[in-house]
């Protein structure tokens, strides 16, 4: 089980990423655009650097929805490998069953 503070920190990051997504995308478009001048680019870089650090999507970490475990995360289910196996064995995940051949 991950600490509650770690889960809260990730929730805060998710909220910040959603809040600043448009602004960040617009600034990145100016920086990478060929039609903008060097001065405009530099201003965009400075504005991008002044945004909160946690508003970058690369700062987010995929975590299990049940335990908050950061490793062994399966995106398709939103669970760690351990919790996926437990829920699968109880028959709570439709379409999955234990392999047998």
From Swiss-Prot:
Organism: Colwellia psychrerythraea (strain 34H / ATCC BAA-681) (Vibrio psychroerythus)
Keywords: Ribonucleoprotein, Ribosomal protein, RNA-binding, rRNA-binding
Any one annotated GO CC term: cytoplasm
InterPro entries tied to this protein: Ribosomal_uS14, Ribosomal_uS14_bac/plastid, Ribosomal_uS14_CS
Protein name from the UniProt record: Small ribosomal subunit protein uS14
Molecular function terms from GO: rRNA binding; structural constituent of ribosome
Gene: rpsN
Keyword flag rRNA processing: no
HAMAP family reported in the protein's UniProt record: Ribosomal_uS14_1
UniProt cross-references to Gene3D superfamilies, sorted A to Z: 1.10.287.1480
Keyword RNA-binding: yes
Organism superkingdom: Bacteria
Summary of the function given for this chain in its UniProt record: Binds 16S rRNA, required for the assembly of 30S particles and may also be responsible for determining the conformation of the 16S rRNA at the A site.
GO terms (BP aspect): translation
Family as reported in the entry's similarity comment: Belongs to the universal ribosomal protein uS14 family.
PANTHER family listed in its UniProt record: 30S RIBOSOMAL PROTEIN S14 (PTHR19836), SMALL RIBOSOMAL SUBUNIT PROTEIN US14M (PTHR19836:SF19)
Quaternary organization: Part of the 30S ribosomal subunit. Contacts proteins S3 and S10.
């Amino acid at each position: 089980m991950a600490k509650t503070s770690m889960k809260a920190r990730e929730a805060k990051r998710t909220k910040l990423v959603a809040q600043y997504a448009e602004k960040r995308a617009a600034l990145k478009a100016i920086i990478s655009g060929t039609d903008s001048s060097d001065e405009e680019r530099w201003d965009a870089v400075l504005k991008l650097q002044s945004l909160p650090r946690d508003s970058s999507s690369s700062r987010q970490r995929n975590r299990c929805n049940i335990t908050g475990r950061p490793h062994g995360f399966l995106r398709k289910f939103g669970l760690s490998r351990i919790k996926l196996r437990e829920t699968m064995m109880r028959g709570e995940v439709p379409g999955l069953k234990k392999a047998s051949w």
